[in-house]
């Protein structure tokens, strides 16, 4: 009985995520993910350059 209960819980969660995903929430989360990607890419490049120059032993 517990497997059926978990299947129904995941069904409800997936339906709710589908409803929210096809509205404006998915666009907002995609914009946020894009901003975070660029921030971490810049941090990675800066640390990579510092690793080859200043922090070289």
From Swiss-Prot:
GO cellular component term, pick one: plasma membrane
Family: Belongs to the UPF0391 family.
Keywords, alphabetical: Cell membrane, Membrane, Transmembrane, Transmembrane helix
InterPro entries: DUF1328 (IPR009760)
Subcellular compartments: Cell membrane
Protein name: UPF0391 membrane protein RPB_2510
HAMAP family xrefs: UPF0391
Major localisation: membrane
């Amino acid at each position: 009985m517990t497997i059926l209960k978990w299947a129904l819980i995941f069904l409800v969660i997936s339906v709710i995520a589908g409803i929210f995903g096809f509205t404006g929430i998915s666009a907002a989360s995609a914009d946020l993910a894009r901003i975070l990607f660029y921030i971490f890419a810049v941090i990675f490049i800066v640390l990579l350059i510092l690793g080859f120059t200043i922090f070289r032993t």
